[in-house]
Amino acid sequence: MGLSMIKYLLVMKICSSLYGNCMPEQTMDHFNTWYECSRQGTVNTLATIDILGEKELNTNRLYVTFTCREINTT
């Protein structure tokens, strides 16, 4: 049997505090460390905010969240 390695899956979603709902989660990349995953989640969050734009964010009170989920790989 192969050795099991822990990796981290970056999962992001866009939510609206105005409407109280979120779009479906989007799985992104796999990372070897928590640091790499959380850093990329922050970078992706800022990029998503820039893409959506100030007007869209303000109108719908949008915010972007992310989490790093631990996964076992072989």
Please give the residue ranges for each predicted region:
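A short, exposed loop/beta-hairpin motif centered on an aromatic-Gly-Thr core
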Residues: 22-36
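Short, mixed-charge low-complexity intrinsically disordered segments
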Residues: 43-74
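Short, intrinsically disordered, charge-biased short linear motifs at domain edges
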Residues: 6, 22-26, 52-58
